Regions:
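A structural motif
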Residues: 1-155
Length: 155
């Protein structure tokens, strides 16, 4: 497999494995993926240009890669707390946590959530309007940001 490319593998109805398909790209990070609706999913990766790029599956076909911007490093993480909502988090070149979100009809601009991370973030949604993001801080501590549907809180 060529370095810096994305691949997918799927099973046919009989359970037999098929070959990996290249989805292209110039990946510099591990991809992150989330689903925001039935038969819909979106994959994200930081490319060699330092920007986040995404590509989505609509249930029938993969759409082309789309640049989402940012000045990022490391590996992104993504989650969804409801239909037509996607949240993506990544560590910026400044060490801060950066957030990008989609909903309901368009991508919103990147926002810095601050902090100084020394690891890639991990995010999870445990209900509608609920997201928790974790990362390692400068002193080896666990940083935590939580969204309650209205505001971010930090611990």
């Amino acid at each position: 497999m060529p370095a810096g490319s994305t691949f997918e593998i799927s099973e046919n109805d009989g359970g037999a494995r098929v070959n990996w398909d290249s989805l292209g790209g110039s990946l510099a990070s591990t991809p992150a993926v989330t689903s925001w609706a039935q038969n819909e999913m979106q994959v994200f990766s930081i490319f060699t240009d330092g920007q986040l790029w995404s590509r989505y599956w609509d249930g029938d076909a993969w759409h082309e890669w789309h640049a989402q911007g940012g000045e990022l490093t490391g590996n992104p993480t993504a989650c969804s707390w409801g239909a037509d909502r996607i949240d993506v988090f990544a560590r910026g070149r400044d060490g801060a946590l950066w957030h990008l979100w989609y909903g309901p009809d368009s991508w919103q601009p990147w926002e810095s959530l601050g902090g100084q991370m020394t690891s890639d973030p991990s995010a999870s949604s445990w209900g509608r309007d609920r997201i928790d993001v974790f990362a390692r801080g400068e002193e080896g501590d666990l940083l935590h940001a939580a969204w309650d549907g209205k505001t971010w809180s930090f611990a």
